[in-house]
Amino acid sequence: MSTIIDIHAREILDSRGNPTVEVDVVLEDGTMGRAAVPSGASTGAYEAVEKRDGDKSRYMGKGVLEAVAAVNGEIADELVGFDATEQVSIDRAMIELDGTENKGRLGANAILGVSMAVAKAAADFTTQPLYRYVGGAAARILPVPMMNIINGGEHADNPIDIQEFMIMPVAAENIRDAVRMGSEVFHTLKKELSAAGLSTGIGDEGGFAPNIASSREALDFILKSIEKAGYKPGEEIYLALDCAATEYYKDGKYVLSGEGKTLTSEENAAYLAALVNDYPIISIEDGMSEDDWDGWKALTDQIGDKVQLVGDDLFVTNPVRLAEGIERGCANSMLVKVNQIGSLTETLQAVDMAHRARYTNVMSHRSGETEDATIADLAVATNCGQIKTGSLARSDRLAKYNQLIRIEETLGEIAEYAGRSILKG
């Protein structure tokens, strides 16, 4: 009865108005799983390949009809007849069918759409919520959100070099209160920016994108907003950064054009260490470029005992890249993006590897999202304790927060908010 009888993909639009892949998987008893694939703006060079058509006459070359055709053709032909509960076998079959190292033939967006839709169909068939189906009986930890309230870099049209400035409400009692705290700070920040004559337009992930050049000015606005909202920075709410440093790494130097600085790896490490010293920052993502292993090592040696150092472009949710980072002693945390590796099975393998190496995991959205809230379930399924899913604006971001609230309600008394347990030391 859990046999796959039909797989159908279509081209839909993501939160940036760009095409993406949505997949329906139908089982013999009529159960259906549906999943939509996200996409990134600042993408790592080592990510699995997102297949785009390249036809400039449609969607400026960003169409995904080839990926859709791959699902409706080769992939469907291969998988119809499989038992949907055999996730590992299904993902392995698609990887072997693709036959490339980076899923470049069929497209990671094709493979991932099917992979997630299969898991959703199987969860429904077994009458379990997705987080329980994937994570088993132990899945009960609600993650601390990293709420992106000021956007810069590739996510906004302003001079700020650092891509994301985030708040983490660790003192909340539960996810419902964490979302409330974040919302209150978000709306307070809007008033503060407006009072300063700055734009309150929002970036790709729902955060504000004011025309300020200094990272310290952005951090000062956030601290003031936390306090005015009635909370204590560095006690109830902490700060986190996503530098996306690969985007401003040019010819072996870090070019902070907004601040008029050009830094060596050592100077960039010192620059970030100074921010950590002056502000209650507990997490920095991609503080160094994806290819600057020496810079990563220097940064980890300098502040890795005090701060969570998250590898996104560095690791791209890839067990091979992660293993190299662990061996080199670079970073201490992995950002988890399902579309970077391109299948649910490989994502879970990478999460497990990080966990065994005592690296933390942060479940993450992409800047191009949809209403699909799968990552909320995966955050709980893996008990990773942290999720990065944007600001308190845009329904594509709020879909994930709302799903976490529902999951917490469903779990009832056994639900546990990760809270202060994520703090180092």
Swiss-Prot record:
Pathway: Carbohydrate degradation; glycolysis; pyruvate from D-glyceraldehyde 3-phosphate: step 4/5. It is found in: Cytoplasm; Secreted; Cell surface. Mg(2+) binds at D242, E285, D312. InterPro entries: Enolase (IPR000941), Enolase-like_C_sf (IPR036849), Enolase-like_N (IPR029017), Enolase_C (IPR020810), Enolase_CS (IPR020809), Enolase_N (IPR020811). It is an enzyme of class 4 (lyase). Binds a second Mg(2+) ion via substrate during catalysis. Its main location: cytoplasm. It catalyses: (2R)-2-phosphoglycerate = phosphoenolpyruvate + H2O. (2R)-2-phosphoglycerate binds at Q163, K337, R366, S367, K388. GO terms for biological process: glycolytic process. One of its GO terms (cellular component) is extracellular region. Keywords: Cytoplasm, Glycolysis, Lyase, Magnesium, Metal-binding, Secreted. One of its GO terms (molecular function) is magnesium ion binding. Its cofactor is Mg(2+). Belongs to the enolase family. This is Enolase. It comes from Ruegeria sp. (strain TM1040). The gene is eno.
